[in-house]
A protein has these predicted regions:
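Basic, glycine/lysine-rich polyanion-binding surfaces/domains
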Residues: 1-205, 209-283
Length: 283
């Protein structure tokens, strides 16, 4: 079992009587799923349907917390305030003390979580939740004080967790999980192209959200020409970006990688005859 301590220092808090309805009208997932014991994953798109932000959400009473990548906090905060208009909400940035990833087989049991996507608990020493995208990505831990951080480090020591971010990256790529920074997705990616439909970021039944029209049209028309896949080579290590060829034809390019595995945006009509193993394309 493994852990990694991120350099993350800020999350966003939205509170007020219109908090749920405000988010419901702009993000791709359904805020009605956001219970006190459940975290969800969602995105905020441009009106043209391209990805601007992705984030986890969890709720504590009348407060909703958005947990984006650190590089996206400022832009997301600005965008939320732009859309706020007359909504009776308060949007603020909240400092945190530390942020951990725990991952590996049955890792959730260490902190008393079930093997359930998005399960959330506020413990006496931290906020913890299973990653709602894919259970193989383990759990996330937010500490608000040095005291909480010390408690988590005691658990790391007692359970003999190994610090290894490379193992996390390997798991992310093998499960075809895009990363907005590493895969260069900001304002470049459509959700259906980059596997967001399969990592619990979209609710098709919730009603309108920003960028919905473009996203729904792509789904209904089946107009995708390229899609994100996990690829693997037994003969080389990948780079990113790197052109991917099959029978001397360019079929796509990598977006992020770890040694001999990578995420790659590939032409759908060019991969039908390529060998696959457990949904991984062998190049």
């Amino acid at each position: 079992m493994y852990y990694y301590k991120l350099k993350k220092k800020t999350i966003i808090c939205i509170e007020g009587k219109d908090a749920i309805s405000f988010l419901q009208g702009i993000i791709s997932n359904n805020t009605n799923k956001l219970l006190n014991n459940r975290a969800i994953y969602s995105t905020l798109l441009s009106p043209q349907g391209k990805l601007l932000h992705d984030f986890f959400l969890f709720r504590e009473k009348n407060k909703i917390y958005l947990d984006p990548v650190d590089s996206g906090v400022e832009k997301l905060n600005e965008k939320l305030n732009l859309y706020k208009l007359n909504s009776e909400i308060n949007i603020s940035k909240k400092k945190i003390f530390s942020y951990f990833l725990f991952f590996g087989k049955s890792i959730n049991k260490i902190l008393g979580l079930k093997n359930k996507l998005g399960e959330y608990k506020k413990l006496s020493y931290a906020k913890v939740f299973n990653d709602p995208r894919n259970i193989n990505l383990g759990l996330r831990i937010i500490c608000n004080s040095k005291k909480e951080d010390v408690e988590i480090n005691k658990i790391i020591k007692s359970k003999k967790l190994i610090m290894n971010y490379d193992e996390y990256e390997k798991t992310r790529i093998m499960n075809c999980i895009p990363d907005i920074d590493k895969d260069n997705l900001y304002n470049n990616a459509y959700l259906l192209q980059y596997n967001f439909e399969n990592i619990n970021s979209i609710c098709w039944k919730k009603g309108c959200f920003i960028g919905q029209e473009v996203t729904v049209k792509m789904k209904n028309r089946g107009s995708l020409k390229k899609k994100l896949f996990t690829i693997k080579s037994f003969t080389k290590k990948f780079k990113s970006p790197e052109e991917i060829k099959y029978k001397n034809q360019i079929i796509g390019s990598t977006t992020s990688h770890f040694n001999n595995i990578a995420l790659a945006l590939l032409k759908i009509n060019k991969i039908s005859n390529i060998r696959k193993k457990n949904k991984v394309i062998i190049i």
